[in-house]
């Protein structure tokens, strides 16, 4: 029992494999679990256990994803691997699997390929903060110069999308040989694990971030004032602290005069908890669902942003027809829908169901947002797409 208890105190980090089809992402995932289990204990996962990825739903979209876990001496990792390219696109855009860092798998025999580029671009757009490169299938390349050339190409590609290409760790390995138990190549998996530990910083926990609560409901309690309810997304709210009410209308200031959960009064509400927050001097009609309560100065309302979106295919319950510029759907942020207009990239006339695309959105009301905020695209309450704010514009 004591061992189990000790494990839970390790920092938890979310990672995943990305890269071109058939470059060895799933084989590498299996090799990491196998070599680390052999070295540090834990469960090994075979290739076919990972390859048969179960379906899951995120924001109404079906995604095939495999989740594995492994440990190094200092950390616990949760790792996602997707079987198909479309699953990666959907996963990264919906944030179904938030990554603190990604392992980009590039076959040394091929070098960077179209999906290599697309996954790096997606990583940039959706805010994957760190990329480590695993140059796979190096056992099949005898030419040192060729390996150096591929490495240089990968570094240039990373730099092109604003990742620090020159400083990115690159491990030369063979996932298959490591999986087969070849000691020389197993050492490369341990080298990769070392970079996961050293290159990806420990993620900041939700509770340590500035307070934010998306408002789900508003009540008036006679003699006490106005209460808003919702789940604390991040941070802590304490009785007596100032808050801002952000989004839809002009930003207002108030003070939290009480926090309650399950009808009990508390001193504070913490990330992950469903709470009611009593606000001083705010009338019931001055506040609504879709706004957020936040620590003053930490989040601003915006109407215009660049986004990366995935449009559901017909089979996924999405649109049956393409849309064109001038399309005006609803954008669902946190707890509410806001109508918006879109601008498509230069040279793109229409967007087909099943496409992923970069678009600029202008909302009719401002919403509290930062880069990285996820949203759904809806038509009359039906989800037709998912997106992420890549860059706030105004």
Curated annotation (Swiss-Prot):
Residues 136-139 are annotated as: G4. The keyword Cell wall biogenesis/degradation does not apply. Changing residue 335 to A: Pulvomycin resistant. It is a peripheral membrane protein. Residues 10-204 form the tr-type G domain. Transmembrane segments: none annotated. The N-terminus is blocked. GO terms for biological process: response to antibiotic; translational elongation. It holds the Pfam family GTP_EFTU_D3. The modification Phosphothreonine is found at residue 383. Inhibited by phosphorylation at Thr-383. It is found in: Cytoplasm; Cell inner membrane. Residues 19-26 are annotated as: G1. The modification N-acetylserine is found at residue 2. GO terms for cellular component: cytoplasm; guanyl-nucleotide exchange factor complex; plasma membrane. GDP binds at residues 22, 24-27, 136, 139, 174-176. Belongs to the TRAFAC class translation factor GTPase superfamily. Classic translation factor GTPase family. EF-Tu/EF-1A subfamily. Present with about 70,000 molecules/cell. Monomer. Heterotetramer composed of two EF-Ts.EF-Tu dimer complexes. NCBIfam families: EF-Tu, PRK00049.1, PRK12735.1, PRK12736.1, small_GTP. This is Elongation factor Tu 1. It comes from Escherichia coli (strain K12).
């Amino acid at each position: 029992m004591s061992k189990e208890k000790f494990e839970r105190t390790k920092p938890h980090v979310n990672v995943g494999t990305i890269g071109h089809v058939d470059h060895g992402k799933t084989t590498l995932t299996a090799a990491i679990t196998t070599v680390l289990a052999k070295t540090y204990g834990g469960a090994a996962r075979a290739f076919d256990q990972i390859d048969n990825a179960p379906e899951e739903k995120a924001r109404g979209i079906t995604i095939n994803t495999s989740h594995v876990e492994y440990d190094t001496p200092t950390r616990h990792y949760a790792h996602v691997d997707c079987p198909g390219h479309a699953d990666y696109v959907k996963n990264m855009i919906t944030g179904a699997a938030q990554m603190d860092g990604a392992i980009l798998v590039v076959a040394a025999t091929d070098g960077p390929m179209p999906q290599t580029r697309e996954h790096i671009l997606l990583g940039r757009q959706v805010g994957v903060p760190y990329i480590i490169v695993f140059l796979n299938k190096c056992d099949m390349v005898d030419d040192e110069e060729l390996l150096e050339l591929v490495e240089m190409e990968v570094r240039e590609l990373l730099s092109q999308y604003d990742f620090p290409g020159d400083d990115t760790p690159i491990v030369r390995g063979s996932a298959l040989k490591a999986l087969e138990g070849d000691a020389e190549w197993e050492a490369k998996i341990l080298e990769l694990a070392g970079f996961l530990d050293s290159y990806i910083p420990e993620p900041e926990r939700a509770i340590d971030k500035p307070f934010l609560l998306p408002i789900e409901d508003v009540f008036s309690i006679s003699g006490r004032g106005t209460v808003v309810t919702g789940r604390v997304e991040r941070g802590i709210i304490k009785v007596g602290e100032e808050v801002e009410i952000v989004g839809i209308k002009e930003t207002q200031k108030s003070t939290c005069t009480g926090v309650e959960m399950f009808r009990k009064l508390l001193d504070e509400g913490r990330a992950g908890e469903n709470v009611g927050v009593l606000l001083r001097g705010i009338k019931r009609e001055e506040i609504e669902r879709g706004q957020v309560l936040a620590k003053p100065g930490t989040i601003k309302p915006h109407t215009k942003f660049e986004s990366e979106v995935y449009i559901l295919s017909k089979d996924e319950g999405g649109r049956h027809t393409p849309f064109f510029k001038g399309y005006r759907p609803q954008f669902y942020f946190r707890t509410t829908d806001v109508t918006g207009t879109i601008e498509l990239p230069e040279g793109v006339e229409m967007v087909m169901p099943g496409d992923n695309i970069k678009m600029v959105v202008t909302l009719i009301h401002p919403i509290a947002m930062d880069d990285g905020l996820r949203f759904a695209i809806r038509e009359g309450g039906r989800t037709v797409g998912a997106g992420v704010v890549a860059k706030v514009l105004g």
